[in-house]
Amino acid sequence: MRDGEGIWGRGRTGGHAHPKEAMHTTFFILGGTMLIGVISDTHLYDRAFELPKAVFDEFSNVDLIIHCGDVTDKEILDSLKDLAKVVAVKGNMDYLNLPRKEILEINDIKIGVIHGDVVYPRGDRLKLRLLGKEMGVDVLISGHTHTPFIDDCRDILLLNPGSPTVPRCPLKSIMKLSVEDKLEAKLIPIEE
């Protein structure tokens, strides 16, 4: 939350959850809007050598950054932490000690975060929707496909920021969320 827009707090329940269990983090926003940067599949050093500067520029004004896995090197998380608080989940290529799932609660909106490698076929929207319902969330953010999407799938919003480094479509991308009384998602193309 930027200066003058109110205050927010954070509480984490569950301590160190088993990797298959979801960590639960609660954010309280009192007045104003919370901006969230969302990124996934950065693959630092196994497929990419650096994160594009445009990512840092786009995330320079966010309150929180969500990384949906396949970080592959702690350096990415450390550099993102210089910009904002970071919540990250473990991807299938990660050897970092991260939870497999996170559930964030921002005011009355529950946001689930997974990598998405448990869904087959890759990125199947019906299976993602069912997983989100099982997690009890209003919004499910995943990665793994390296392909961005915003899909209002009946009673759950499905989001995927794509990849800013190794996309499986022509578009390198990240996402920004704006949360006040409702959540709005915007796909951000990354130019090099």
Swiss-Prot record:
Its cofactor is a divalent metal cation. CDD domains: MPP_YfcE (cd00841). A divalent metal cation 1 binds at residues 41, 43, 70, 146. Binds 2 divalent metal ions per subunit. Gene3D superfamilies: 3.60.21.10. SUPFAM superfamilies: Metallo-dependent phosphatases. Keywords: Hydrolase, Metal-binding. Its EC number is 3.1.4.-. A divalent metal cation 2 binds at residues 70, 92, 115, 144. InterPro entries: Calcineurin-like_PHP_lpxH, Metallo-depent_PP-like, MPP_YfcE, PdiEstase_YfcE_CS, Phosphodiesterase_MJ0936/Vps29. GO terms for molecular function: hydrolase activity; metal ion binding. Pfam families: Metallophos_2. Belongs to the metallophosphoesterase superfamily. YfcE family. This is Probable metallophosphoesterase MJ0623. It comes from Methanocaldococcus jannaschii (strain ATCC 43067 / DSM 2661 / JAL-1 / JCM 10045 / NBRC 100440) (Methanococcus jannaschii).
